[in-house]
Amino acid sequence: MFNGIIYKKGIVTNIKKLKSSIYLTVQSKMKLSNKDIGSSICCNGACLTLVKVKKNFLDFFISHETIKKTNFKIIKNNDSINLEESIKFGSKISGHYVQGHVDLCSKVKKITQIGKSWVLKISIPLKFRKYIIEKGSVTINGVSLTISKVNKLDFDITIIPHTLN
């Protein structure tokens, strides 16, 4: 379980496409060691199991199901990804509870700048609409965000400069 607050990023350094899966290597400044192998790491919103650690390089195996439902289907070398370690007992919860079980990829339909903030209009298939409520939470690429407006086939989120950084 995670909370959707991103303190670390990683850079994709190797993508090994297998028959129906991906073996992914990410360079990161996360302080992990061999004792952390098997731990859950939130990578762009998806809960992935850490399978290898070597210095600042983290390896993950991505299943076919995860590829289908996430942006890992279009990931490239040198892409930046959001990383978050799982919540530890007693740690601060700043976002919302994030399981890392991704339902779908959506498209950004429109971006509007309002002052120093950005409003993103994001499409949502009708069958998922019932889960999207105004002032509710949504996780996008691992980031906990508040839904500011809901329409029939899309919803809005507002991103402040701190979140964008």
Summary of predicted features, one role per range:
Residues M1-N165:
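Conserved loop->alpha-helix
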